[in-house]
Every structure is written in structure tokens, then in C-alpha cells.
Amino acid sequence: FVKMNHSIADAAALAIFTPAGIIVHTGDFKIDYTPVFGDAADLQRFAELGKKGVLALMCDSTNAIRPGFTQSEKTVGKTFDAIFAEHKNNRIIVATFASNVDRVQQIINSSNKYGRKVVVEGRSMVMFISPKASK
């Protein structure tokens, strides 16, 4: 397993060693040098695999064909802080994927920082943030 970053916790790529050669399967990933939680992707390990020779690379990254780069997820947290600071007396409704636990945590952090209540809707969201989910 090779450490990767993505919107889900514990994302990893697989390096599969076969008699014919090394096959690398990344799954969907995002290179984030300053992730909200956890370590950055293990690019050193990818370099080591490359030096050994990779027979096939199967990878997927959202917006990979779009020029430029995607900012760190930490940028989103700063944006939430700015929104909460600007709208102290207004209701704020945020929609996100329940599986994007880094983003959900940043929403909760900003809510707490500005003394706001968090109301969770949706079965998946409730399941992901419930204390029971960690058991």
C-alpha cells in the first residue's frame, strides 16, 4: 500500500508485484502537500517504484485533464471561516459528501469557532459523524 490523499480517509494506492512486473493502481487521488488530517501522499515511494520499473499504471484523478492544480483542502477550511465570520447573524447551509470527513470536520470546526449550532441531515451524514460509527 502507498499512502495517498483524497476526500476519503486512509486513501491508498496498491503496488502489485507480479512475475511480469509491478502494477500500480491508485484509485482516485489528489496530491495535497498540506492535507487537513494525516500525512501527504508518499511520493518518495512512487519514485522508488518507478526506479524499479512499472509495467502498468492504472490511475484516476478528478479533473486530471484540466490545466493547473487543485488547492489544498485546508483552503476550504479558511473559506468556511471567512463565510462564518461574515455571516454571524445569518443561517448558513452547507452541502457536502458525507464521506469527505476532512471537509465535514472543517465545517464543524468553523461552526464551533463562531458559536454556531450544527444540524445534520441525511442518513449517510448522520452515519459518518455519529460516535457509533467509530465503534
Question: How should these model regions be labeled?
Answer:
Residues F1-K135:
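His/Asp/Glu-rich metal-coordinating catalytic cores
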